[in-house]
UniProtKB/Swiss-Prot annotation:
Protein's organism: Helicobacter pylori (strain G27)
Name of this chain's protein: UDP-N-acetylmuramoylalanine--D-glutamate ligase
A biological-process GO annotation: peptidoglycan biosynthetic process
Principal location class: cytoplasm
Residues reported to bind ATP: G102, T103, N104, G105, K106, T107, T108
Listed EC numbers: 6.3.2.9
InterPro entries: Mur-like_cat_sf, Mur_ligase_C_dom_sf, Mur_ligase_cen, MurD
Length: 422
């Protein structure tokens, strides 16, 4: 079979290895290629312009590629990673799948739930790092998938047993064009889910037509206390606060519902679940606190790549002066709602990256102190010179990092290095 992989990345490379083992002819097409060549593994790589839809029998798209890209528009047999993997399931092997999506918190919640479901041989995958084809080849029986809006947009058949949508706030608007498209992508899977499946959804979307018309069973939630009350767990039984408390509560709710589907009693598992969850360590670059040589508090929240994540971070330090490093690739999002919230805080801004001039203009409009630093190192130096012991220095950029860094991880690591440098 002649297979075209649109985009040369982790997901499509894993698929290419699988296709090669099964004696298919595989070609990659990507904008980053300027001429035909073979990659390190010997796969054929072509510039996007060389794609011929008549010379291809199957196209699998890398989720980050826009639906308006010429490759996608020209493709005649386009499938998502999820739909292709779904086509491989049969009577011999079909895993149980739980999908988790949301603007913020999906990685943490996926990791928490995978830890809770360890005894059921759960493995995590999807956006979190492990491509689905690798989970398939390992024949893992229970998949906990962090699922992006891009993957959901391209998927037309595959659906999970349980779908958790944590939240939807403005993000990825450059890709989706507008918020309505972004929300519809997050909800699209509900149009595919049957009566035997379950969707756990934010209460504020209850009246949305897609949700109203979905056959799936539904549970709605509003905040962490209400979720924990439903599970008969006092909020002080968990060692998390703020947005992380909601992530933990929702992981427990999905776990409880999974047990119910398996005809197992929640009360028999509850105490052990709390112990396991309280032993869970939040990943790097998510509200990660550390102190400089003078004992002053700095917070690495580099994973805050959108407005909602930054707002959640600010709530943690409501009563303290905050020195906030803001900026990067804002992905077409209007930052005005963020600045409207700044009125409720004692805050000074340090603008970096490609959106620095936008941040400066909004700061002038809202009368908020702002220094245009452009570079992260300069922002750290400026804060170091004024930061007092009872104040907070926070990197929560409300933007992607790719205008200046290879990833949010590199941005966070450099932030820590600049702070700790003499």
């Amino acid at each position: 079979m002649k297979i075209s992989l649109l985009g040369h990345g982790k997901t499509t490379l894993a698929l290419a290895r699988f296709f090669k083992k099964n004696h298919n002819e595989v070609k990659f097409f990507d904008d980053q290629f300027t001429a035909f060549h073979k990659d390190e593994e010997g796969f054929l790589c072509y510039p996007s312009k060389d794609f011929n839809p008549n010379d291809s029998q199957l196209e699998v798209v890398s989720p980050g590629i826009s639906f308006m890209h010429p490759l996608v528009i020209k493709a005649k047999h386009l499938v998502s990673e999820y739909d292709y993997i779904n086509s491989l399931f049969d009577l011999v092997f079909t895993p149980t799948i739980i999908s988790i999506s949301g603007t913020n918190g999906k990685t943490t919640t996926t990791e928490m739930l995978t830890a809770l479901l360890e005894d059921f041989k759960a493995v995590s995958g999807g956006n979190i790092g492990t491509p689905l084809i690798e989970l398939f080849e390992k024949q893992s029986p229970l998949w906990v998938l962090e699922t992006s809006s891009f993957s959901l947009h391209y998927t037309n058949k595959a659906y999970p047993l349980i779908y958790l949508l944590i939240n939807v706030e403005a993000d990825h608007l450059t890709w989706h064009c507008n918020f309505e498209n972004y929300l519809n992508a997050k909800l699209k899977v509900l149009t595919l889910m049957p009566k035997t499946s379950l969707a756990i959804l934010p209460l504020k979307f209850k009246e949305h037509p897609i949700i109203q018309n979905s056959q799936a069973q539904k549970i709605f939630f509003d905040h962490s206390e209400e979720v924990l009350e439903r599970l008969k767990i006092p909020s002080n039984a968990l060692f998390f606060k703020g947005a992380f408390l909601l992530d933990a509560a929702l992981a427990l709710l999905v776990y409880e519902q999974f047990l119910k589907i398996k005809n197992l009693k929640w009360q028999d598992y509850r105490e052990n679940a709390l112990k396991r969850l309280n032993a869970f360590k939040i990943g790097s670059h998510k509200m990660e606190e550390f102190r400089d040589k003078e004992g002053r508090l700095w917070v690495d929240d580099s994973k805050a790549t959108n407005i909602d994540a930054t707002l959640q971070a600010l709530k943690t330090f409501k009563n303290q002066k905050i020195h906030l490093i803001l900026g990067g690739d804002i992905k077409g999002v209007n930052l005005t709602p963020l600045f409207e919230e700044f009125k409720n805080y004692k805050i000074s801004l340090y603008a970096i990256g490609s959106s620095a001039s936008i941040i400066q203009a909004l700061a002038l409009e809202f009368n908020i102190s702002c220094q245009v630093c452009l570079k992260l190192e300069k922002a750290v130096q400026e804060i170091k010179s004024v930061l007092l012991q009872n104040e907070i220095a926070l990197l929560s950029p409300s933007a992607a990092s790719l205008d200046q860094f290879s990833s949010y991880k590199e941005r966070g690591e450099k932030f820590k290095a600049f702070v700790l440098k003499d």
